[in-house]
């Protein structure tokens, strides 16, 4: 039975121009739950406030937790939270295809948001392969070790248990498997984290690896911070420092163990993310030679590509490599479909995802973000597909060129919004990401985190009133938590993601007709399909979270 839509006009305020005068929403027929819903002319928008979680400590512990979302002045968010239906979503652990208790991240979050189902992540798949002995039976890995016999095997990647880009246990498993396969020389080039983990947790991870590597005879020969080795914004001067350390043995020569050397760097004021290149063996000489095998054990692609290109591309022009060893280059997962290098774990193919369905229906969609999150609203949101769907437009706004985003917490949010406002009326679906809460949250600088949150709130105050004037609808959510916990219990900065829940707020002229159920990130795509008046495919196992009242 059809239900007729009634209109609720909230007293929504634009912080720049004052109260918004909105025309009434035309009455439309709306068929609830499992049936078609006729959408109005305005766009449907998914607004992802990246890294904006809900700290269970609330206002009482906002200073103790360094909760930038509650320390900030957010009058527009407060109004949305008060006047529109909302609920909470789980964005971590098994609810997003990660191991139980594992914090979420942007790649995982956007995969689940776009797929409309729980997407079992590479971390989970690789852990399972190691536990069940499948890793050592992998054909690509066996061929890799065969190539490494008589040469050096170089294991490069992020050494931490952050689980966002890698897990150090995977490196240990690869080293053990290589030893069992007859590989004699195993060099580990370790990237320290400090972003998805504690800023000074790296020494402990290295200490564990030093012990675990004794079985395989592997040795840590390089340590360098991810700031240099995992840049993704074409800051090639950073990548060159990592290349020079790994390939040419250039850096600070250390006589102590890697863990002890890193501890000393802490005393000198350095932290893991910004760890300068440290060299422990074969200093100031070419260490990667023709015929060697280089295995990049990060499972997430975006921050592994620049260094990979330096190894792979003949016409590479990011920096002067000085030498280009002809190596057998292998990656744990597929980093890019254009790369010729083999990979150990093939990507999981996802069908009937949100972008595909919207495109097949002949609707126009816009994906927009600044550089830091552009891959997430495109490649990851589309299930690992690089090519846009038909009628899917993409707009990239360059992120500011600063060393760390606490120096410019506004990032490029205002430029993003200018672009959205100019294009909004031309699309049926808009996927928008605000990078600030996550990227500034990673710095651990609370004052900057507060400014980042306030920046996003000001942007929301510009975009939502315009959307409502167009009779559009918005879902406001996040991909994971971060900036709601920027201080640890001991008072030290917290730079990692959290496992906290995230907001789910429905903003529309008809919002009073609905309540929002709690759910998981996989429920967002089915809800958007409902708002677009499109049927939900069987492969989308999430649920529409809007329930009529």
Regions found by a protein language model. Name each.
Residues 7, 18, 25-549:
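Feature captures the catalytic ectodomains and active-site-proximal regions of enzymes
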Residues 3, 12:
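Cationic, low-complexity basic patches in intrinsically disordered or flexible, solvent-exposed regions
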